[in-house]
Amino acid sequence: MSPTIYDIARVAGVSKSTVSRVLNKQTNISPEAREKVLRAIEELQYQPNKLARALTSSGFDAIMVISTRSTKTTAGNPFFSEVLHAITAKAEEEGFDVILQTSHNPAEDLQKCESKIKQKMIKGIIMLSSPADESFFAQLDKYDIPVVVIGKVEGQYAHVYSVDTDNFGDSIALTDALIESGHQNIACLHAPLDVHVSVDRVNGYKQSLAAHNIAVRDEWIVDGGYTHETALKAARQLLSQSPLPEAVFATDSLKLMSIYRAAAEKNIAIPQQLAVVGYSNETLSFILTPAPGGIDVPTQELGQQSCELLFRLISGKPSPQNITVATHMTLK
């Protein structure tokens, strides 16, 4: 028969309420009593019943991670796998489970979130991207549960927080660098404009062109979608145009990889015939030859900081509404 909290109390020589406070991670207990309880738990190999604890206390020790996109559109995207790894590692340190939420559309996402909140299955939410339509945030904000978004949050909310990089400013700086190196005909291969990050990166590119009195050519601003297939199709389309752009600004890793492959197919030498820059990471810079210049996205740090912020909020500690993570630009 599995040991109970009564057994722990007997072995530790403390009351049942003291054992309960330790299991629920409450602070109103002496270090000596806590140590006795922890030793008894280890000796008895006690495994708490999470369902029973959830029904009799403040809920499960779990957080939810939402991609806000279908698994089809996130498969193969290194950003999501890397940031999720950072989040799960931090949650494990805190003794929390991670529920990965997937769905077909925002309405289904919201329905699943509300269901888990009402059932006390989660104590916080991390969103891996920030939709340009913030109605999702407004709906979640009605609940007394912290939500941390990896991305920009424009509206004012009581329970919605942001961890992001300066995508607009970084894109201006990156396009400025291309122009200052002598390029005038610069194309942009971007992700769909239904998320803040894509909007900010494309707007930063356009702002830089305007500041240098370079006309924006609509045919050189191409939506590469969310998958490898759509990105490669868009890259091939872009590199089939005449005249060919001198440089391409890619707004994420998938677009960078697609430009490299399309250029190889068409025997276009990088960087001799086509300069390529974009948002990348150390792994991609190691794979692609020559390594692309651009903005190194601090994926691990975004995941870690978002998780640390969420656990501060869960603990009731004062926390900033917005955190901006610094990036690093490298030009090859």
UniProtKB/Swiss-Prot annotation:
SMART domains: HTH_LACI (SM00354). PROSITE patterns: HTH_LACI_1 (PS00356), HTH_LACI_2 (PS50932). Keywords: DNA-binding, Transcription, Transcription regulation. InterPro entries: Cro/C1-type_HTH, HTH_LacI, Lambda_DNA-bd_dom_sf, Peripla_BP/Lac1_sug-bd_dom, Peripla_BP_I. It comes from the Bacteria. CDD domains: HTH_LacI, PBP1_LacI_sugar_binding-like. Residues 5-24 bind DNA. GO terms for biological process: DNA damage response; DNA-templated transcription; negative regulation of DNA-templated transcription; regulation of DNA-templated transcription. GO terms for molecular function: DNA-binding transcription factor activity; transcription cis-regulatory region binding. Residues 1-57 form the HTH lacI-type domain. This is Uncharacterized HTH-type transcriptional regulator YcjW. The lineage of its organism: Bacteria, Pseudomonadati, Pseudomonadota, Gammaproteobacteria, Enterobacterales.
